[in-house]
């Protein structure tokens, strides 16, 4: 791969020295470099291939880092990272000690706002714009947001607030690629489709390109053109009702259209909204055909594409959930499945195919997803909300107020619990035990392997109230999974190994590591299964027959399962040493999942080491 043009770019300042016509070969080399890099490291691909020209145009037109660019979600920022001095570190992408897969303020002065969760960009850019106004600093503020992210209420809350905020410069760029991770859904997506498919759209786009090539960046002339193009496409838009001056749609891969348009918008004061149309996977045919498959691939050979594994892989927890959901739906016609735009990631593909009328993708709208489930439960339906642990944080008030307070029968399947590996701190599901344990009526189940996941899903589904089952990303220990829909007693654990003096109480998928450590420690291991209700009877037995207890969880130790155990011991008036092992009170960066766990002492060797250090006198 030749990069003779890209080799000359060490910062956006180098871009701005070039003639516009020199950018096309840079775009081609940049796209090829992104493909080659991601194929070697894994990471987000389709979205980054789709933002090459837009990224080039933004850094070419605006004075970054003085001008602020906030990238919504942020998984489309690899071209941005490459152009802002991090090209030589792309080989470390999403690896321990390497660069993040998302914008990160501590990583570069060009990363103006840390993102990874959706729909935050307009709010952040608006805050920056107001701060610049208050400080008397003249700069531009740009929020780049995808059409999938526009389905979240927060984006519209920010636009509504911006509409009544005076004397600021804010440009919102809608990157319309008709995809979030799963295809976007809802009325907004249909509205955007109507804008793009209007009878004047194609003519307007072509004429706009021709006109812009000859338009100098003069304020009045720019306004005249924008009003003319706008009138050809639509007489009024939803975005203008918020107080934004709407421009577009324009081709997001055409630098000759993008750059003059951005230059004109740069001269305007106030609220601007630019609608650009891009294609996920642009320039790599396999990703264009299947942008979902190539959304976040592992390592692969670009010449042949992603291939099926030669040897059968162990079932992932997500696959176990997906199979259970279909089986439970077959047995109970009241079951409905809900996902906030994560059909593939949460394992609902087969469920949608088999039960399309009972499948609901509500878009990137976690608050709505939870309360929608509450409404279904009010009328006798049995909703299962399949959601990443980190994204349930966005619907916490709804969990408390709309579900738990009314003791409604909603089951939460919390995928990606604990450390998630390459996606890092922004996607870690470390806090669910702590923030759910304090909510009355809520059941929290922590399965230790694949079969336990199925058992506890069935158990929580049978419970007539709010319940959550948390399980991690990836595969477990390879346990055989039963075919039935059996349940276990609610709030009851089970002893997996009998030992002496020390008892390890495991919550979740670290139980196999605890068993390995216990062989060397001659310790008892209890698979507690539930954080809430906690098996106090088993706890009392372990306290009475052992000299020390160890609690173990792949979640934040502060407020977690270990805290529940110490609280229960205190309530019972029982006093004995307790070692609480879990995730420390820090944000843990990206890296290999197993290596990160080992780094905080939560592999078998680390568990053994911690127990020996704390209870050396008991172990001799």
Curated annotation (Swiss-Prot):
Enzyme Commission code: 2.2.1.7
Pfam families: DXP_synthase_N, Transket_pyr, Transketolase_C
The protein's annotated pathway: Metabolic intermediate biosynthesis; 1-deoxy-D-xylulose 5-phosphate biosynthesis; 1-deoxy-D-xylulose 5-phosphate from D-glyceraldehyde 3-phosphate and pyruvate: step 1/1
Reactions it catalyzes: D-glyceraldehyde 3-phosphate + pyruvate + H(+) = 1-deoxy-D-xylulose 5-phosphate + CO2
Residues reported to bind Mg(2+): 147, 177
Domain of life: Bacteria
One Gene Ontology term from the biological process aspect of the record: 1-deoxy-D-xylulose 5-phosphate biosynthetic process
Annotated InterPro entries: Dxylulose-5-P_synthase, THDP-binding, Transketo_C/PFOR_II, Transketolase-like_Pyr-bd, Transketolase_BS, Transketolase_C, Transketolase_CS
Signal peptide, first to last residue: none
Binding annotation for thiamine diphosphate: 75, 116-118, 148-149, 177, 284, 366
First-level EC class: transferase
Gene3D superfamilies: 3.40.50.920, 3.40.50.970
Keywords: Isoprene biosynthesis, Magnesium, Metal-binding, Thiamine biosynthesis, Thiamine pyrophosphate, Transferase
Cofactor binding: number and manner: Binds 1 Mg(2+) ion per subunit. Binds 1 thiamine pyrophosphate per subunit.
Keyword Transcription regulation tagged: no
Cofactor: Mg(2+); thiamine diphosphate
Residues annotated as transmembrane: none
GO MF assignments: 1-deoxy-D-xylulose-5-phosphate synthase activity; magnesium ion binding; thiamine pyrophosphate binding
One cellular-component annotation, GO: cytosol
Function recorded in the entry: Catalyzes the acyloin condensation reaction between C atoms 2 and 3 of pyruvate and glyceraldehyde 3-phosphate to yield 1-deoxy-D-xylulose-5-phosphate (DXP).
Family the UniProt entry places it in: Belongs to the transketolase family. DXPS subfamily.
Record's subunit section: Homodimer.
HAMAP family: DXP_synth
Name of this protein: 1-deoxy-D-xylulose-5-phosphate synthase
Organism expressing this protein natively: Bordetella avium (strain 197N)
Gene: dxs
């Amino acid at each position: 791969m030749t990069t003779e043009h890209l080799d000359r770019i060490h910062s956006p300042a180098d871009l701005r020295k070039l003639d516009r016509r020199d950018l096309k070969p840079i775009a081609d080399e940049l796209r090829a470099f992104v493909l080659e890099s991601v194929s070697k490291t894994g990471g987000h691909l389709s979205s980054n291939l789709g933002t090459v020209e837009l990224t080039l145009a933004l850094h070419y037109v605006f004075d970054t880092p003085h001008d602020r660019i906030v990238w919504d979600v942020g998984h489309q920022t690899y071209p941005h990272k490459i152009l802002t001095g991090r090209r030589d570190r792309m080989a470390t992408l999403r690896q321990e000690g390497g660069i993040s897969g998302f914008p990160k303020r501590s990583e570069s002065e060009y990363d103006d706002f840390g993102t990874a969760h959706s729909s935050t960009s307009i709010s952040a850019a608006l805050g920056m714009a107001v701060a610049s106004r208050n400080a008397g600093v003249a700069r531009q503020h740009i929020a780049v947001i995808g059409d999938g992210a526009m389905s979240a209420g927060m984006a519209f809350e920010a636009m509504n607030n911006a509409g009544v905020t005076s004397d600021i410069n804010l440009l919102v760029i809608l990157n319309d690629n008709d995809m979030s991770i799963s295809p976007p859904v809802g009325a907004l997506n249909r509205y955007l489709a109507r804008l793009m498919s209007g009878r004047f759209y194609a003519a307007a786009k072509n004429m706009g390109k021709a006109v812009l090539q000859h338009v100098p960046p003069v304020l009045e002339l720019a306004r005249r053109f924008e009003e003319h193009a706008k009138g050809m496409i639509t007489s009024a838009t939803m975005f203008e009702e918020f107080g934004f001056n709407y421009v577009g749609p324009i081709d997001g891969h055409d630098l000759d259209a993008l750059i003059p348009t951005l230059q004109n918008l740069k001269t305007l004061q106030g609220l601007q909204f630019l609608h650009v149309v891009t294609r996920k996977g642009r320039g790599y045919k396999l990703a264009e055909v299947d942008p979902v498959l190539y959304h976040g691939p592992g390592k692969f050979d670009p010449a042949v594409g992603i291939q099926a594994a030669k040897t059968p892989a162990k079932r992932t927890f997500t696959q176990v959930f997906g199979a259970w959901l279909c089986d439970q739906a077959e047995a109970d016609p009241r079951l409905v499945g809900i996902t906030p735009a994560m059909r593939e990631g949460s394992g609902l593909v087969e469920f949608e195919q088999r039960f399309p009328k009972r499948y609901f993708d509500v878009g990137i709208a976690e608050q709505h997803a939870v309360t929608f489930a509450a409404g279904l439960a009010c009328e006798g339906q049995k909703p299962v909300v399949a959601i990443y642990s980190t994204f349930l944080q966005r619907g916490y008030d709804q969990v408390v107020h709309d579900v738990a307070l009314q003791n409604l029968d909603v089951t939460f399947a919390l995928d990606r619990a604990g450390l998630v590996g390459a996606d890092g701190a922004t996607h870690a599901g470390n806090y669910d035990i702590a923030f759910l344990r304090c909510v009355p009526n809520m059941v929290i189940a922590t399965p230790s392997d694949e079969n336990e996941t199925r058992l506890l899903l069935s158990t929580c589904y049978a419970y007539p109230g709010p319940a959550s089952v948390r399980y991690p990303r990836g595969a477990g220990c390879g346990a055989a999974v039963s075919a039935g829909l059996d349940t276990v007693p609610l709030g009851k654990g089970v002893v997996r190994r009998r030992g002496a003096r020390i008892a390890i109480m495991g919550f979740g998928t670290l139980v196999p590591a605890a068993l390995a450590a216990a062989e060397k420690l001659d310790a008892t291991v209890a698979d507690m299964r539930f954080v809430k209700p906690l098996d106090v009877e088993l706890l009392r037995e372990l306290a009475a027959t052992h000299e020390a207890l160890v609690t173990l969880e792949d979640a934040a130790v502060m407020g977690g399962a270990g805290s529940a155990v110490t609280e229960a011991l205190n309530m019972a008036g029982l006093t004995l040493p307790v070692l609480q092992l879990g995730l420390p009170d820090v944000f843990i960066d990206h890296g290999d999942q197993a290596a990160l766990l080992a780094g905080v002492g939560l592999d078998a060797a680390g568990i053994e080491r911690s127990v020996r250090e704390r209870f050396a006198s008991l172990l001799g």
